[in-house]
From Swiss-Prot:
It comes from Saccharomyces cerevisiae (strain ATCC 204508 / S288c) (Baker's yeast). The lineage of its organism: Eukaryota, Fungi, Dikarya, Ascomycota, Saccharomycotina. GO terms for biological process: mRNA splicing, via spliceosome. Pfam families: MA3. Present with 3260 molecules/cell in log phase SD medium. One of its GO terms (cellular component) is Prp19 complex. It comes from the Eukaryota. Its main location: cytoplasm. Belongs to the CWC22 family. This is Pre-mRNA-splicing factor CWC22. May be involved in pre-mRNA splicing. The gene is CWC22. Residues 22-204 form the MIF4G domain. Residues 520-537 have a biased composition (Basic and acidic residues).
Length: 577
């Protein structure tokens, strides 16, 4: 058989295979819904989609351009993310083709098709299939052309993720939108849509990713693709058409290996509950260091919190080691100069994956506050407070975990009080005072917000929260303290009255006993005075003689009539006269 004949037979065989793949793939994608997503993903692997990857890309683009499929775009995006995990070429091709198709439809002013494509690209950005540079190119183009409706649609879906990975550009876009809202004359509908978007941002995009399919991190590998549009690039019009495959046999062997791997994974997932075995780790000092080093390298090599969570969960860490992993995550976050939401998003994914991770985070929080708090510096306390405040505000950790804190001068240290300050400031920033007050009322945090017991404890707590600018949280304590003080004042007044009554009784007893003792005392005094007078009168002769002898020896004076009383000689006196 000649070479030309062999080549013709080969092309014929490949064409028949291509037709079979196309007839199998097209109905699966055209009938795709969120309910049959996983089943559709499995069905695609019944044919060699390594050879037919362009067929899948063509069907995805056509599905997106169909104006009636707007509500099914989330399911399509999830399917692309699953396929990209196994075959990254599909994600790379679709990132380019969807971007070029958007530019083409935008120039044609087909805004419905543009909306579908943007929805798909935005969700793929959330799944880390495409890089943020793709979304930023689109947003800058839309702002330049003043296509505000499409900008609003994109920001509603992926604005929260854009704020995490490219904060400066995110803020620049918002400043541009604020300027447009304040300076330009807009229709009432468009103005209302913009105001709604600003309200969503104020709530930190809490409803941004609702309704999306949650990918299993243990079986999902992240491959992120970027593409920069140039003026010369155009969408591939031949996408999905038959082309001879030069490496047909190699792709066939590679697909068999891939399908076998997927079958093994599915079988292990199915039998995991019945055939699971306890994983044993040798945690000697050497292996402990290696284990921590491995976790640390996973964190530092990840571009996003979602990617880090996927890598960590893929390790299938035993329950007794999860607390160590959480401790490494927190220590890594404290090495940053400021608080990074990378670690909070990572923690969100870990906690929601299994309740054993929530237990590990609860135990680590208790250890941070009760044992390690005095070892942290002020900047680290700020990061630590924001980290735990974020998890508590979004209810990944319950408010009851704060029950271990008792806010008194004796049972709290300065570092602990600084930590509480930053934690509550983060709670207020995330929830607002009103929502925080409602949550505190539903949780009995007697250690920080006491309503019973010692008045000094209540007073200290009031003074603390007032000093950090959260005095509104202390209204119940203030009312309770007023009641306690009134009760204490009444008890003190009653005590004084009892003391005065006792003192009055003692005085009364003293007055009653005074008349019986008074005359005896008086008579005894008279007796002593009389005895003293008699003793002074009845002196003995010996005493009189003694007194006479004791008189002065000065010569006796003469009579008062004697003229010469002076001792001056008479003659001298006469001369003087």
């Amino acid at each position: 058989m000649s070479t030309a004949t062999i080549q013709d037979e080969d092309i014929k065989f490949q064409r028949e295979n291509w037709e079979m793949i196309r007839s199998h793939v097209s109905p699966i994608i055209s009938n795709l819904t969120m309910d049959n997503l996983q089943e559709s993903h499995r069905d695609l692997f019944q044919v060699n989609i390594l050879i037919g990857r362009n067929i899948i890309c063509k069907n995805v683009v056509d599905f997106t351009l169909n104006k009636q499929n707007g509500r099914l775009i989330p399911a399509l995006s999830a399917l692309i993310a699953l396929l990209n995990s196994d075959i990254p070429d599909i994600g790379e091709t679709l990132a380019k083709e969807l971007m070029l198709m958007f530019v083409q439809q935008f120039n044609r002013k087909d805004y419905v098709s543009c909306g579908n494509i943007l929805q798909c690209l935005s969700i793929l950005f959330l799944y880390d299939v495409i890089h943020e540079i793709v979304i930023l190119q689109i947003l800058l183009l839309l702002l330049e052309k003043n296509s505000l409706r499409l900008v609003i649609a994109v920001m509603k879906i992926c604005g929260w993720k854009l704020a995490l990975v490219s904060k400066k550009t995110h803020d620049m876009i918002w400043e541009k939108l604020r300027y447009i809202l304040q300076t330009q004359e807009l229709s009432s509908t468009l103005r209302e849509s913009l105001e709604t978007l600003f309200e969503i941002r104020q709530k930190d995009y809490k409803s941004g990713s609702q309704g999306l399919f949650i990918l299993d991190p243990t079986s999902y590998t992240v491959h992120t693709h970027s593409y920069i549009v140039s003026d010369e690039d155009e969408a591939n019009k031949e996408l999905g058409n038959f082309e001879k495959c030069e490496n047909f046999n190699e792709l066939t062997m590679a697909f068999d290996t891939l399908r076998q791997k997927l079958l093994i994974n599915n079988t292990s997932d199915t039998n995991e509950g019945s055939n699971s075995q306890l994983q044993i780790y040798d945690m000697t000092s050497t292996n402990d260091v290696e284990f921590k080093k491995k976790i640390y390298l996973v964190l530092k090599s990840s571009l996003s919190g979602d990617e880090a969570a996927h890598k960590l969960l893929k390790l299938k860490i035993a329950n007794n080691l999860k607390k160590s992993v959480v401790d490494i995550i927190i220590k890594s976050s404290l090495q940053e100069s400021t608080f990074s939401k990378f670690y909070s998003i990572l923690s969100e994914r870990m906690i929601t994956f299994h309740r054993s991770w929530q237990t590990a985070y609860n135990e680590t929080f208790e250890q941070n506050y009760t044992q390690d708090i005095e070892d942290y510096e002020t900047d680290q306390l700020r990061i630590l407070g924001k980290f735990w405040g974020h998890l508590i505000s979004y209810e990944f950790l319950p408010m009851d975990c704060l029950k271990i804190i008792k806010l008194t001068e004796e049972e709290s240290c300065p570092q602990g009080r600084i930590f509480i300050k930053f934690l509550f400031q983060e709670l207020v920033n995330e929830l607002g005072l009103d929502e925080l007050q409602l949550r505190l009322n539903s949780s009995k945090l007697d250690g920080m917000f006491p309503l019973e017991g010692d008045a000094e404890h209540i007073r200290y707590s009031i003074n603390f929260f007032t000093a950090i600018g959260l005095g509104l949280l202390t209204e119940d304590m203030r009312s309770r303290l007023t009641i306690i003080q009134e009760v204490e004042d009444a008890e003190e007044e009653e005590k004084k009255l009892r003391e005065e009554e006792e003192l009055e009784k003692l005085r009364k007893k003293a007055r009653e006993s005074q008349p019986t003792q008074g005359p005896k005392i008086h008579e005894s005094r008279l007796f002593l005075q009389k005895d003293t007078r008699e003793n002074s009168r009845s002196r003995s002769p010996f005493t009189v003689e003694t007194r006479k002898r004791a008189r002065s020896r000065t010569p006796p004076r003469g009579s008062r009539n004697h003229r010469n009383r002076s001792r001056t000689p008479p003659a001298r006196r006469q001369r003087h006269r």
